[in-house]
Amino acid sequence: MNRITQKLQEDKKILSIYFSAGYPNLNDTVQIIQDLEKNGVDLIEIGLPFSDPLADGPTIQASSTQALHNGMTTQILFDQLQNIRESVKIPLIIMGYFNPMLQYGVEAFCKKCAEIGIDGLIIPDLPVDVYADEYKAIFEKYGLINVFLITPQTSDERIRFIDSVSNGFIYMVSSASVTGSQSGFGNVQETYFERISNLNLKNPQIVGFGISNKETFNQATKYAKGAIIGSAFIKHLSESGSGKIQEFVGEIR
């Protein structure tokens, strides 16, 4: 069974953390992953930096740009993660844009992910229809879960289609804006969370965008299986370096 599926079956709210691979320094990636697991994080999203990130807010864009400047590439990330399963047991997801995956070769990329123990992918600019028609069989061949994003603007019909081709969780974007642009949730988000809850989807949902502290984590997980923190963690890395992860996670849990 895929590690993501196993984790989702646990009777707890999932804390997922996103960071850009190769940030703050090129070789910080593995240490950050190990420290996040050690401090009780349930799931890690490793951002593969890309030069034209559509959905990312300024904080994640800046970290991605710095990581590219540091020399991060798809191959270097794979090399860094080659032995990650010797020390890390929790689910790992690579989040990135489709272009670098296409350049590497979709099947070669999926094969490499499976070899090193990556459990899933999040590719915001890969349309679900294209995935279902052209790539689903490849992902499944290598045991990878593909996670799709939904927003308040996504129709119920589209959400049900996404649910039907998904086999892990659905990434529930809390607003239609870019990451890191909110603090807290208002009535609009609460109505949206309730709407999704009432659809009774087969896949659990994890909320992302706008989660930055204990309050927003607890608010989001009232309606969902878990929540993802990205921009706030990257800000913490930029201000405190990779040595104070315990402090950050301790304030959420």
UniProtKB/Swiss-Prot annotation:
EC class name: lyase
Q: Which residues form the active site?
A: 45 (proton acceptor), 56 (proton acceptor)
> What are the coiled-coil residue ranges?
none
Subunit info here reads: Tetramer of two alpha and two beta chains.
Catalytic reaction list: (1S,2R)-1-C-(indol-3-yl)glycerol 3-phosphate + L-serine = D-glyceraldehyde 3-phosphate + L-tryptophan + H2O
Q: Which GO terms describe its molecular function?
A: tryptophan synthase activity
This molecule's function is given as: The alpha subunit is responsible for the aldol cleavage of indoleglycerol phosphate to indole and glyceraldehyde 3-phosphate.
Q: Could you identify this protein by its name?
A: Tryptophan synthase alpha chain
Q: What is its EC number?
A: 4.2.1.20
Q: Which GO terms describe its cellular component?
A: cytosol
